[in-house]
Amino acid sequence: DFKLVKEALKERDVLLKIMPHICWPMRFLIPLQSFKINNFFIRCGLLIYDYIAGYSILPKTETTNLQNSSFNAFLKSKFTKAYIYSDCWVEDSRLVVLNAIDAKKRGANILTRTRVINFEKKGKLWNVITKNNKGEIHEFLCKCIVNAAGPWVDNINNYTRSKNTFSTRLVKGSHLVVNKLFDHNYAFFLTGNDGRIIFVIPFQDEYSLIGTTEVVHQNMDQKPMCSDEEKDYLLNFINNYFDFNLKTDNIISSFSGVRPLYSKNNQKSKNMSSITRDYVLNLEFIENLPFLTIYGGKLTTFRKLSENVLSRLKDFFPEMGSEWTMKNSLPGGDFLIHEKKELVLKLQKKYPFLDQICSNRFINYYGTLSFEILKNVKSKKDLGKNFGHSLTEIEVDWLLKNEFAKSVDDILWRRTKLGLKFNDSEKNKLENWLKYKI
């Protein structure tokens, strides 16, 4: 996937520029054993990695001696040195909602809790039929349909008479969240005897994120969940590298996602890692109407993928403008990455009753929109009810009015990650308040 890697590496600097509040640099450490032939190939790979990336604000790969390093505090003694390379972290749930907010601001109609149940030809247009969580049926006319349903892409295609031979392989990836394992902000890139790679990543300041597995997921009717086997696999993987002995009791939370990998002619590969992570855009005409399906794709290249989709559809929208997303920040991202600490200090100076953790969280979630959220706040009392862990009425109101939030899970997991900290009593307090608010 040389093309995909090149595109993703070039894209990192763009993402750091247009969304510096939810995307930031991260250094990854690869522990190595002495005199292993794999060390040479890993170093060659990293040299190519840096070369493909070209000029970047991210630092290049370096080598460190672990025996005289603080990194060696928990690593087993057999690991004597390490390579350290650069990549980026993206707050994925914030990325999704900020794109939706931006689209709405530019004229899009965002329908949450609404699913497509059918579509049909109506004259020279598509008629898309939807059903929301209240059972209401709505119909929409459009020139073309873009099937960007991710793991549900094949389900949507079943509504058509499509003759394409493309499909998706559903691969479940599970993650574990444990209390912070290290007192630094480096991530670990770990390789196993089975050829798989596991990451240990600093997560939400107080935790470490461990993942991910790769397991075939049969269909989306089955809710993806981290199995006991996956938990054992990840814990054993980590324990082979570090002196501590993580057990299931150390797991604070676990979650699973499903990746829809592109598959041609329903190819079945037992090795999930061998299936491409690249995306394929398939434009076809069904009853003489354009229908474009997106297969596969990665989070890193979401912007390029979206621009390529519109480029393919330009003939149907002759008034479409030129590409613009590279130069336009997502909501709250109108500052430079090196200005982030200064922005936190500015927030604290204007609102001295916000503690350090809350100020950091606001800038990491909302960027410059933090000042819009708090514009009418003059004192701590103006924040309203405190539901716990610095989540107050003023923030929840913003999420309800501006970020399409409707439920406790929306607020604690899909807009923030405060669900990691909230206990049952705090959740109930928030839920009871929402009953009177919505």
What are these regions (language model features)?
Residues 1-70:
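Dinucleotide-binding Rossmann-like beta1-alpha1 core, especially the glycine-rich loop
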Residues 6-7, 21-30, 60-64, 99, ...:
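Short coil/turn segments at secondary-structure boundaries
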Residues 47-98, 109, 437:
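Short linear elements at protein peripheries
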Residues 79, 86, 92-94, 102, ...:
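C-terminal catalytic lobe of FAD-dependent flavoproteins
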Residues 83-144, 303-304:
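Helical element adjacent to the flavin cofactor pocket in flavoenzyme catalytic cores
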Residues 122-124, 130, 151, 157-159, ...:
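Short acidic, glycine/serine/threonine-rich loops at helix termini
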Residues 140-150, 238:
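Short hydrophobic core segments
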Residues 147-162, 307:
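Flavin (primarily FAD) binding-site architecture
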